Amino acid sequence: VHVTEVDINVYKCYIQKMETILISRGQVAELLPLDVCIDAVETAFRLLGEGKVAHPSTLGVHVGNGGFHVKAGAAALDREWFAAKINANFPRNPVRFGLPTIQGLVALFDAENGRPLALLDSSELTALRTAAATAVAAKHLARPDSTTATVVGCGRQGKAQLRALGRVLRLGRAFALDADGARAQSFARDLTSELSLDVTAVEDLPSALSETDVLVTCTPSPTAFVRRKDVRPGTFIAAVGADDEGKQEIEESLMAASVVVVDLLPQAALIGDLHHAIARGLMRAEDVRAELGAVVAGRAQGRTSREEITIFDSTGIALQDLVAAVAVYERAQDRAPRFNFGD
C-alpha cells in the first residue's frame, strides 16, 4: 500500500480530533482569570434569561460522610457545547484525610458530534464560576454604593467570593467569619495583603451585620444562622452554601421578608434556602421576584429601592460550569496534555 505524506497528515489530523485535553486544577486557575469568568457567567445568565438554553435539575447522591452532585447542560455559543460536572462534597475531608472539601471533574463535549473535548478538575472551576455568579448578582441586586462586605465561610470559595465582589463593587473593608477561628484569621491576613482591603476576622455575626452592605454565606451549615432581626435594610445577601435539601443558611422569615432572586427556580425550590421557606409555608415559588437570568436580560427587575433586602439564592447551575469550562478549553490548546480514548 502506497502511503503519501498527505495520507499521514490526514491521519494525524484525525487522531488530534479524537484527543481529549486533560486540564489540572492549577491550569484552571492559570487559564481562567476572574474577570473573564465573570463576563462568561454574565453572558450565560443572559442566554438563560432569553430562553436560549435549558437545564435539567441537579442529581444528588448522599453517602456516609458527604455526597455527590451531578449537573449537566448544553448551550449554543460560538458552537454547540455540552458539559457535565460531578462534584464530591465531603466537609470533613480536610481534618480526616487532608483532602479538599470539594473534588470532582467537568467533562466538556462537542454537542454537534459528541466528541469529548476536555476533562477538567472541577474544584477551582466551581469556586470561580460560583463567585462569578455572585458578582453578576451583586451588579443588579446590591446597592451601587456598597462598601462593606461580610464573608461567612473562609475556605477557597470564600476567598473567591471576596475577590469577585471587589471586581464589581468599591469595597473598603470586609469582615470574615468561620467556625475555625484560625482559618478566619488567615483569610483576613491573606486577603488584606492581596486586595489592599481592610479585612478583619470577627466572631460575632450580628455585630458585623450591623455594618454590612453585602453578605456572602458559603458554608455547609445544616441550620440557618442569618436571622431576620440582625440584617439591616438595604443589605444584599448571596446565599451560596445551600445546594442540597439538608443545608440551610438563611432564616425562613428573612427569606419571606426579602426580595429573592434565584439562579434556577425549580432547583432553588427543591434544594436552596428557598425550599425551607416554602416548606414552612412562609413563601411560594411564585413569591420569588425572578431568576437572575431574567434580571440580566432586562426582563425582570432587580433591586428597586435602597431599603430592600435582596437575596440571591445560588444553588449552582450547569451553564456556569459549561461557559467556564469553554473559556479554559479555548486557552488550553497548546498548554495541556492530551489523551486519546480511542487507542
Briefly describe each language-model feature range.
Residues 246-343:
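Adenosine-phosphate binding glycine-rich loop
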Residues 38, 42, 131-139, 159-163, ...:
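Predominant activation on well-ordered alpha-helical scaffold segments within soluble catalytic domains
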Residues 168-194:
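NAD(P)-binding Rossmann-fold cofactor-contacting core
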Residues 196-282:
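Rossmann-like adenosine-cofactor binding region
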Residues 148, 172-173, 198:
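Residues at the starts of beta-strands that form the adenosine-phosphate
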Residues 131-134, 142-168, 178-183:
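Glycine-rich adenosine-cofactor-binding loop
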Residues 7-127, 135, 145, 290, ...:
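N-terminal ligand-binding/catalytic initiation module
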